[in-house]
């Protein structure tokens, strides 16, 4: 999230809260300290002041509702994101990345030998269940594409559909727990001497052969001299996170299609951090000069993938809470001011037989009218503004009725509680004291 945008939003929210919340409350306090000193001559001015404060409170309630609804939507969105299926299991997976220098690994055979020896050493470590390598690790922010089409279709390569690709070793799918839909995973026999093979994701399979079995089909893949046979279909993996439409499409065996990047995925039976040092030493046992970087748990990457949504949720939650507090203060201030101005009227009503409950309901109705008007304006504002936040939501509609109703009830309930204090005070006024009140 851009820090300037965040700072600007914070400043606007604070200023808005102060203007719409504290201003009415402070004004009400001033009025309460010298009530109706100018009961005759100042009547028009008092009425204008009341209308202004009421208008400000209605605006505050409306803006508070919009912020509360936005906070509720982002909270639901974040919950959906955290629980979303990435296409693999990030728990208990250690990752690290190496870039074998071309000065020492001049041929494909040398790169293949390095990966096999390093993986063999890592798999022998206590607590390691499976280990494999991949070119572009999911959620790392790195990805690449290749053109891909069914063999026999006369489509120029620059016009073929493109799909994210990865070069992987056989145990990669087991290490990441990517589900096999049909066919098989890569095996050691799928080496540089064997016929080219490929595994494709479920979505790509539906695109290429929507009404047929993709197994056994041959694909023309960009960069490959020969067609590759589809030997397996796996579940979709969200390469850049659940909010992205970038889904891993085609997997090629590292033994047949090498790459200058090797990202290790190591599934462990215990805390992955506990085997990090030993895994690095297993790589250095093959090449003591090989730099090893990007050492972290896959669950940490998964957490970072939803970090922008987490920050947005926290910011809007903070702003929503501040706005709710200011709305409550504003409503309290206006009702307290109204009670102070109407002390004589209340005394007359009670002298003529009005009961405490009647006065309580009278004052509460005044507060309820302001709150309901603010809620109505806020709901109208939500319908007009929420479509602009749809791009940052996941798994929830911008106009989710449960969120709207929940925010409205939370705001209305809090505001009515703020009305109750001055209303109760008004219901306990002594009529004789109120009639002498000037």
Q: Where are the language model's segments positioned?
A:
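Membrane-helix entry/capping segments
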Residues: 1-11, 41-57, 147, 256-261, ...
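Alpha-helical transmembrane segments of integral membrane proteins
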Residues: 1-105, 393, 432-438
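Hydrophobic alpha-helical transmembrane segments of multi-pass inner-membrane transport and secretion
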Residues: 19, 49-77, 309-344, 372-373, ...
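Intracellular coupling helices
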Residues: 30-43, 329-370, 428-436
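Mid-to-C-terminal secondary-structure elements
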Residues: 74, 113-308, 314
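Transmembrane alpha-helical interface segments in multi-pass membrane proteins
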Residues: 323, 344-390, 406, 410, ...
């Amino acid at each position: 999230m851009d820090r300037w945008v965040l700072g600007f939003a914070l400043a606007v929210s604070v200023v808005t809260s102060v203007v719409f919340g504290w201003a009415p409350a402070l004004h009400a306090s001033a009025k309460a300290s010298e009530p109706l000193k100018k009961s005759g001559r100042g009547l028009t001015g008092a009425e204008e002041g009341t209308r202004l404060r009421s208008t400000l409170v209605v605006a505050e309630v409306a803006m508070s509702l919009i912020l509360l609804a936005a906070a509720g939507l982002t909270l639901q969105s974040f919950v959906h994101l955290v629980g979303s299926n990435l296409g693999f299991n990030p728990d208990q997976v250690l990752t690290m990345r190496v870039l074998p220098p071309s000065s020492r690994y001049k041929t494909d055979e040398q790169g293949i030998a390095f990966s096999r020896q390093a993986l063999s050493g890592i798999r022998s470590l206590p607590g390691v269940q499976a280990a494999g390598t991949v070119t572009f690790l999911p959620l790392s922010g790195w990805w690449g594409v290749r053109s891909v089409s069914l063999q026999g279709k006369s489509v120029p390569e620059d016009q073929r559909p493109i799909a994210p690709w990865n070069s992987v070793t056989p145990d990669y799918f087991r290490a990441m727990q990517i589900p096999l839909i049909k066919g098989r995973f890569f095996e050691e026999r799928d080496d540089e001497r064997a016929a080219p093979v490929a595994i494709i994701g479920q979505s790509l399979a539906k695109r290429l052969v929507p009404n047929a079995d993709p197994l056994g089909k041959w694909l023309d893949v960009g960069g490959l001299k020969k067609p590759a046979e589809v030997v397996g279909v796996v579940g979709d993996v969200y390469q850049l996170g659940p909010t992205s439409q970038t889904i891993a499409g085609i997997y090629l065996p590292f033994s047949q299609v090498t790459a200058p990047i090797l990202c290790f995925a190591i599934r462990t039976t215990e805390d992955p951090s506990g085997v990090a040092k030993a895994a690095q030493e297993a790589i250095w046992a093959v090449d003591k000069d090989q730099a090893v970087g990007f050492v972290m748990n896959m669950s940490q990457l998964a957490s970072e993938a939803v970090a922008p949504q987490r920050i947005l949720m926290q910011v809007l939650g903070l702003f929503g809470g501040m706005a709710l507090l200011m709305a409550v203060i504003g409503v309290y201030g206006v009702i307290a001011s109204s009670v102070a101005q109407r002390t004589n009227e209340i005394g007359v009503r009670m002298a003529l037989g009005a009961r405490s409950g009647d006065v309580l309901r009278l004052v509460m109705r005044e507060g309820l009218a302001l709150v309901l008007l603010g809620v109505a304006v806020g709901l109208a504002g939500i319908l007009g503004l929420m479509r602009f936040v749809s791009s940052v939501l996941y798994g929830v509609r911008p106009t989710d009725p449960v969120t709207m109703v929940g925010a409205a009830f939370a705001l209305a309930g809090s505001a009515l509680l703020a009305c109750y204090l001055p209303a109760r005070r008004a219901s306990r006024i002594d009529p004789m004291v109120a009639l002498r009140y000037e």
